Amino acid sequence: MTQDELKRLVGQAAADYVIQNVPEGAVIGVGTGSTANCFIDALAAVKSRYRGAVSSSIATTERLKSHGIKVFDLNEIESLQVYVDGADEIDAGGAMIKGGGGALTREKIVASVADTFVCIADASKRVPVLGAFPLPIEVVPMARTAIGRRVTALGGVPVLRVTKDGAPYITDNGNEIIDVKGLQIADPRGFEAQVNAWPGVVTVGLFAERGANLCLLGTENGVETIVYPAG
């Protein structure tokens, strides 16, 4: 199967998981990116079962609304039973690198209030050690260079994310993103806490403190379900 076919496979598997495990009338947390889009497309077929969704980005909001799925502000919702999102990398403990699509901060916020984080990914995203995929850090623009120096001191190579015309990429929150190459992140939880403590960092695209509870992994043999231990 192609990568796109695997994404559609896990998108449908996530919709099936929601149908089987989330009661009718609930609100679903939805991530951002091409794999999350496949979940949205599959969820649209059963949208009448649910009140709607909480979105993690402007792009996801637009896609949900295009399917007629009501979008709630997170401040309107007391709790979420499930959050479904993709990953750029996921390790054996359920820690992830996320943020390739630029929505890492809102993704982390929505994931933090969900009872269950369901990661959907193709098998290429499963790695023994995080870091081959550049680690995104969302930063307040005035702190960009200072954060870059801190990254360099740790052995990373900071690269400012830019648009096609060479201008800095601006997140939905009005900030910039540094993508860090050359890392091997043996302690994702510790590294997440370290980077998040730097002044000027909005958040780092490590999802270790709040990692995945479950991964639906698309493989040539179908969908593999991986459950991660709590904590």
From Swiss-Prot:
GO BP terms: D-ribose metabolic process; pentose-phosphate shunt, non-oxidative branch
Record pathway: Carbohydrate degradation; pentose phosphate pathway; D-ribose 5-phosphate from D-ribulose 5-phosphate (non-oxidative stage): step 1/1
InterPro entries registered for this protein in UniProt: NagB/RpiA_transferase-like, Ribose5P_isomerase_typA_subgr, Ribose5P_isomerase_type_A
Enzyme class: isomerase
Catalysed conversion reaction: aldehydo-D-ribose 5-phosphate = D-ribulose 5-phosphate
HAMAP family per UniProt: Rib_5P_isom_A
Binding site for substrate: 32-35, 85-88, 98-101, 125
Catalytic residues identified in the record: 107
Domain of life: Bacteria
Protein family according to the UniProt entry: Belongs to the ribose 5-phosphate isomerase family.
Name this polypeptide is given: Ribose-5-phosphate isomerase A
Subunit structure, as described in the record: Homodimer.
NCBIfam families hit by this protein: PRK00702.1, rpiA
